[in-house]
Design a protein with these regions (language model features):
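C-terminal functional extensions of proteins
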Residues: 238-319
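Electropositive, gly/pro-rich neighborhoods at or near active sites that engage anionic ligands
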Residues: 32-172
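Redox- and metal-dependent alpha/beta enzyme cores, enriched for Fe-S-associated oxidoreductases
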Residues: 209-248
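Active-site glycine-rich loop that binds ribose-phosphate moieties when present
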Residues: 168-187
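Extreme N-terminal starter segment of soluble prokaryotic enzymes
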Residues: 1-4
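Short Gly/Thr/Asp-enriched flexible loops that form oxyanion-binding sites at enzyme active sites
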Residues: 16-20, 204-217, 279, 283
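Short internal beta-strands
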Residues: 29-33, 224-231, 267-273
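A short helix->loop->beta-strand "cap" motif at the edges of active sites that frequently abuts
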Residues: 24-26, 221-225, 266, 287
């Protein structure tokens, strides 16, 4: 079975670990979000790609869900002693090595997709991890801080400001001019199932869909497309997805996120059992819906979510 997954960071990575447990023999291609990418200290940092790579490769800080296990921060402390910022983004020593290798390879002329493949040679994540594009795309958020309206990088909004001010707009800068990375459209065309994990629908999955040709390829793939709600009981399972949903005019409910994706894209949608009351609303929107437990409390819970998603895909296929 060929499965394509559009993934952001922590939620996407943990779902993928469950998917690998549920169907160990499946051929899984992950299209990773690069809208979170940021340049720090002259290095290109790809938080979502790295979170997927580290999680599936066994090097993730399990407690945080991001960054490396057994991490130290000597380099960060030395940079701070020189007054070199920013100090709000916690890059560890082991993590720095990844970004140095990536930046060196990009400087030598390799595209991000080839660099990501090379990095995965070390981590052996057991999936094919492709960035959504080799072009530079950065998600920016329009905010008002101290009476001044300005655009900040998504990482600054998320990490430094902790989404403490309303997001007035969310824009994937550069997306309109970008092209899907090599292998992205081919993977979608060859897929048996396409899954949207419980990643952020605006700044993770939404950014991938903003790359010209990706949304159209998924809509026209002719195979089941099933998503899992990142909203449980009208609140994000983790993170601050409600803040960026508000910026695009979507209420923070499982049903509203399904409607945001739309029946032209989604065939099936899983909501948590606490949101069973919204199943009818989703089905009225033309999307087959089931209520199942959606809390990834451990690996088996994530694996069961993946099984439910694949079961719904087969239900859609047989309809």
């Amino acid at each position: 079975m060929r499965i394509v997954v559009l993934a952001g960071g922590i939620g996407g990575a943990r779902f993928l670990r469950g998917l690998k447990q549920a169907v160990p023999d499946a051929d899984v291609t992950v299209i990773g979000n690069t809208g979170d990418d940021i340049h720090l200290f002259g290095l290109k940092v790809c938080p979502d790609l790295d979170t997927v790579m580290y999680t599936l490769g066994g090097g993730i800080n399990e407690e945080q869900g991001w960054g490396r296990a057994d991490e130290t921060f000597h380099l960060k402390e030395e940079l701070a002693a020189y007054g070199a910022g920013p100090d709000w983004f916690g890059l560890g020593d082991r993590d720095f090595a990844t970004h140095i290798v990536r930046t060196q390879m990009l400087g030598a002329g390799y595209p991000l997709s080839a660099v990501t493949e090379a990095l995965c040679d070390r981590w052996k994540p057991g999936v094919r991890l492709i960035p959504m594009t080799d072009d530079r795309v950065e998600t920016h958020v329009a905010v008002e801080v101290d009476g001044e309206r300005k655009a900040v990088h998504f990482q600054e909004y998320w990490v430094r400001l902790r989404a403490s001010v309303p997001a007035e707009a969310v824009v994937p800068v550069g997306a309109e001019q970008s092209k899907p990375a090599p292998g992205v459209l081919e993977a979608i065309a060859e897929a048996d199932v396409i899954l949207f994990p419980p990643s952020n629908p605006v700044v993770s999955v939404g950014t991938i869909l903003a790359v010209p040709g990706v949304r159209e390829a998924i809509a026209g793939a002719g195979v089941p497309v099933v998503g899992l709600s990142p909203i449980v009981g009208d609140a994000p399972v983790r993170g601050m997805a409600d803040k960026v949903l508000a910026a695009v005019g979507v209420e923070s409910t499982a049903a509203a996120v399904a409607e945001h994706y739309g029946s032209g894209l989604l065939d099936g949608w899983l909501v948590d059992t606490v949101d069973a009351g919204s199943v009818a609303r989703v089905e009225e929107a033309g999307i087959r819906c089931r209520a199942v437990p959606l809390m990834m409390t451990d690996l088996e819970a994530a694996a069961q979510m993946a099984r439910e998603a694949l079961a719904l895909a087969e239900e859609v296929r047989g309809a």
